[in-house]
């Protein structure tokens, strides 16, 4: 598994554990897990500061920190966990990304079908709403295995249409107070509509790991059902033709099967971000190897050898091959590293396997065939 994907999955695990404890009123355990998630996300920011998702990681860190402060107010001095601190009312200003995402469609290698689907659903209606008398999709679900660029594609859309970008997750909505979580959902959507109306700019509400917030689970309480119902109500409100708000909801998930059918119907576009095919792998390899010195590397052969690898995996393979020759330079006390050759890639592929199991891909394919909506 690639380092970035591994860290993202670790942060996600801690965040899910934090939200679970949060829902159960266990503030101390929630704080512990939010802090662990922050530590991992901070590592991601440090390692991938120049990456297109660094700003999103930082946004998540800030949201988890805010949630920790709220939870601390709920813990009395004796640590019993039943304090009467302030309610968890979401501040939408804190969820709006202050800086425009740096990534655009040109930065995304491959995924042409995905980009075209998003242009049809969001870019064209935003630029020429007069050409869409029947309206256009307001809900877009992007799904697929980790490491295939779901978060990056959402950020790129926001850049393409110069929109406000509101990032939402379970931590920003959660509350132990009865009725507060659904009020938070309503507040997010109301603020998005007000922003769009005031400035005439589109607004994207991006919900990462949407299954954690709105998926169906065996052990859930009435509050989670109410949040889902409120969300469905707000999604229906976006379709009101009497109000031409340019507000879109993009949900991203690695587990689309956690979402029930009434919820899926609100997402008129359901876009599967697959593992890269051979042409996309070739494009990815050309893109990443353009930054390093190479000698006698057959990109076509390498593209065949990397079948089953994610885009993130391929980046890590190129990085590992380059690190291999740098290590050799230090070991042999040379002045400069030699060029990376085909043998370097073959050696790396012996010790780096795809981060996504082929059996899991079959599950994605089966779900896609049943629910696809491009």
UniProtKB/Swiss-Prot annotation:
Q: How does it assemble?
A: Interacts with CdvB.
Q: Name one GO cellular component term.
A: nucleoid
Q: Which InterPro entries match?
A: AAA+_ATPase (IPR003593), AAA_lid_3 (IPR041569), ATPase_AAA_core (IPR003959), cell_div_CdvC (IPR054951), MIT_dom (IPR007330), MIT_dom_sf (IPR036181), MT-severing_AAA_ATPase (IPR050304), P-loop_NTPase (IPR027417)
Upregulating conditions: Induced around the genome segregation and cell division stages. Down-regulated after UV irradiation, indicating division inhibition in response to DNA damage. Expression is highest in dividing cells.
> Where does it reside?
Cytoplasm, Nucleoid
The source organism is Sulfolobus acidocaldarius (strain ATCC 33909 / DSM 639 / JCM 8929 / NBRC 15157 / NCIMB 11770)
Q: What does the similarity note say?
A: Belongs to the AAA ATPase family.
| Role played | Part of a cell division machinery. The CdvA, CdvB and CdvC proteins polymerize between segregating nucleoids and persist throughout cell division, forming a successively smaller structure during constriction.
For this UniProt record, the keywords arranged alphabetically read as follows: ATP-binding, Cell cycle, Cell division, Cytoplasm, Nucleotide-binding
Q: Which domain of life is it from?
A: Archaea
Entries under Pfam families matching the protein: AAA, AAA_lid_3, MIT
Domain MIT: residue ranges: 11-73
Per the record, what about its domains? Answer: The MIT domain is involved in interaction with CdvB.
Q: Which residues form a coiled coil?
A: none
Could you say which residues bind ATP here? 144-151
Please give the name of this protein.
Answer: Cell division protein C
Q: Name one GO molecular function term.
A: ATP binding
Q: Name one GO biological process term.
A: cell division
- Predominant localisation class: cytoplasm
């Amino acid at each position: 598994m690639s380092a970035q994907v591994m860290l993202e999955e670790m942060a996600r695990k801690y965040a899910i554990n934090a939200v679970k404890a949060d829902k159960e009123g266990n503030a101390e355990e929630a704080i512990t897990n939010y802090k662990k998630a922050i530590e991992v996300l901070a590592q991601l920011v440090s390692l991938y500061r120049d990456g297109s998702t660094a700003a999103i990681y930082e946004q998540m860190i800030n949201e988890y920190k805010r949630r920790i402060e709220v939870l601390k107010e709920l813990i009395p001095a004796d640590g019993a966990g039943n304090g009467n601190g302030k309610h968890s009312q979401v501040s939408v200003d804190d969820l709006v990304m202050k800086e425009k995402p740096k990534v655009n469609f040109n930065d995304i290698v491959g995924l042409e079908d995905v980009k075209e689907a998003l242009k049809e659903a969001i870019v064209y209606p935003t630029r020429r709403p007069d050409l869409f008398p029947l309206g256009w999709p307001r809900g877009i679900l992007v799904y697929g295995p980790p490491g295939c660029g779901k978060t990056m594609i959402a950020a790129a859309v926001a850049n393409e249409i110069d929109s406000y970008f509101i990032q939402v997750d379970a931590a920003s909505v959660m509350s132990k107070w009865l009725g507060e979580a659904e009020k938070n959902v309503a507040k997010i959507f109301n603020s998005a509509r007000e922003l769009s109306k005031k400035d005439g700019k589109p607004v994207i509400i991006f919900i990462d790991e949407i299954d954690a917030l709105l998926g169906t689970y065996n052990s859930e309480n009435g509050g989670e059902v109410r949040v889902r119902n409120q969300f469905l109500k707000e999604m229906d409100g976006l379709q009101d033709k009497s109000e031409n708000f340019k507000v879109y909801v993009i949900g991203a998930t690695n587990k689309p099967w956690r979402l029930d059918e009434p919820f899926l119907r609100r997402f008129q576009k359901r876009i599967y971000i697959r593992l890269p095919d051979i042409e996309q792998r070739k494009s990815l390899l050309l893109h990443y190897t353009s930054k390093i010195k190479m000698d006698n590397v057959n990109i076509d052969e390498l593209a065949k050898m990397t079948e089953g690898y994610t885009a993130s995996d391929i980046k890590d393979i190129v990085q590992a091959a380059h690190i291999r020759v740098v290590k050799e330079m230090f070991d042999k006390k040379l002045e400069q590293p030699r060029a990376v050759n085909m043998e370097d890639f073959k050696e790396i592929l012996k010790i780096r396997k795809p981060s996504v199991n082929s059996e899991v891909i079959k599950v994605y394919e089966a779900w896609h065939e049943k629910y696809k909506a491009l």
